[in-house]
Amino acid sequence: MNLNYLDFEQPIAVLEGKIQELQLVGTDNDLNISEEIDRLKEKSTKLTENIYSSLTPWQIVQVARHPQRPYSADYIARMFDDWDELHGDRHFGDDKAIIGGVGRLNGRPVMVIGEEKGRSVKEKVERNFGMPKPEGYRKALRLMEMAERFKMPVLTLIDTPGAYPGIDSEERGISESIAQNLAVMSRLRTPIICTVIGEGSSGGALAIGVGDYLNMLQYSTYFVISPEGCANIIWKTVEKAPLAAEAMGVTSSVLEELGIVDETIAEPLGGAHRDIDTMAEKLKTRLSEQLDQLVAEDMDSLLERRYKRLMSYGNAAS
């Protein structure tokens, strides 16, 4: 896979370009330049470690939005056996910005629900760039209630720039659909684990984000409004987005300190897009371990703790 490098990764891109040039020269001329290639690879690894050890919140926002970052569909394909996608909300239609269905995680039946941005231009349009409409959240709700009936745990994968704010979305009750999901998820009698895999923005993320565990991948973000939106409101210019990202505390490390996030799951060096298979295996292992803990707990105690957790959001005294 040819990687797209972000602005702050350009020194890495230069080194990787030299490595590729030397590899081509070695192939064409049968020259033994493996030692030089190994030296440059080691240098590139150290440079990547150095850059990624001190990322700013705004740089982490960029990594979370990386065009090659794995989406929900990528994780589902790698983590779940016997996957069977389910469609429609039984009220209006099938929103492709939300994908959901039944699969097996290490043999255990689970209901998986994820927000999906789409990879190609055509797919991005079909999936509305990962911005669900009311029918998407109602589809998610239908699948969660089905999971409760069949005693299957629910796993959600959060990755959205936000719920779709268009007129048609408002006409069909986007606010009500989000609120209904919050209410039902808070009392759903089955374990729920939520994981932010990319962008977790506003009510669009929270609508499938109420659970017993909330994980964030290391370079994912979670916020009430995008840094650009915040900057535009407060400073009247998007150029202040880096400052807004810093002030809002959008990263997993800050949110874990605040008690909003339970666990940060480490990503491969350079981000999840550098090694999707390794990231998927790591996430699969951790979700399986968390499910083992949750299914062993008393359901009433689980629900009480889940509800208290939801009510504590935004409470400075919690």
From Swiss-Prot:
As its record notes, the protein acts as a catalyst of: N(6)-carboxybiotinyl-L-lysyl-[protein] + acetyl-CoA = N(6)-biotinyl-L-lysyl-[protein] + malonyl-CoA
Gene Ontology annotations of biological process type = fatty acid biosynthetic process; malonyl-CoA biosynthetic process
Q: Give the record's pathway.
A: Lipid metabolism; malonyl-CoA biosynthesis; malonyl-CoA from acetyl-CoA: step 1/1
GO molecular function annotations of the record: acetyl-CoA carboxylase activity; ATP binding; carboxyl- or carbamoyltransferase activity
Q: Which domain of life is it from?
A: Bacteria
**Compartments (UniProt record):** Cytoplasm
- The parts of the chain that form a coiled coil are none
**Which InterPro entries does the record match to this protein?**
Acetyl_CoA_COase_a_su, ClpP/crotonase-like_dom_sf, COA_CT_C
Tell me which EC number(s) this protein carries.
2.1.3.15
A single GO cellular-component term from the record reads: acetyl-CoA carboxylase complex
Report domain CoA carboxyltransferase C-terminal positions: 36-293
Quaternary structure, from the entry: Acetyl-CoA carboxylase is a heterohexamer composed of biotin carboxyl carrier protein (AccB), biotin carboxylase (AccC) and two subunits each of ACCase subunit alpha (AccA) and ACCase subunit beta (AccD).
Give the protein's function.
Component of the acetyl coenzyme A carboxylase (ACC) complex. First, biotin carboxylase catalyzes the carboxylation of biotin on its carrier protein (BCCP) and then the CO(2) group is transferred by the carboxyltransferase to acetyl-CoA to form malonyl-CoA.
**HAMAP family, per database record:** AcetylCoA_CT_alpha (MF_00823)
> Know the name of this protein?
Acetyl-coenzyme A carboxylase carboxyl transferase subunit alpha
Q: Which organism is it from?
A: Teredinibacter turnerae (strain ATCC 39867 / T7901)
